[in-house]
Amino acid sequence: MPQISRYSDEQVEQLLAELLNVLEKHKAPTDLSLMVSGNMVTNLINTSIAPAQRQAIANSFARALQSSINEDKAH
């Protein structure tokens, strides 16, 4: 079942493109890009979510990430 978002596809795609452009500008390899992205998520959770909700949000985020991973063999 598709997820309904309060954000338009255009908003999401524009922000994603800008974030990817920053990583490309700095020629960040995949491992550094993942590290920085993970740190950004951690920072957002720790600074924007109430302490009592942080673990649930982190678990929900992790499940969403895992469910969005493409399992084909190509990379």
Curated annotation (Swiss-Prot):
Gene3D superfamilies: YejL-like
Signal peptide residues on this chain, from the entry's feature table: none
InterPro entries in the cross-refs: UPF0352, YejL_sf
Taxonomy, superkingdom: Bacteria
Family stated for the protein in its record: Belongs to the UPF0352 family.
NCBIfam families cross-referenced by the UniProt entry: PRK13689.1
UniProt-recorded name of the protein: UPF0352 protein YejL
Annotated organism of origin: Shigella dysenteriae serotype 1 (strain Sd197)
Gene of this entry: yejL
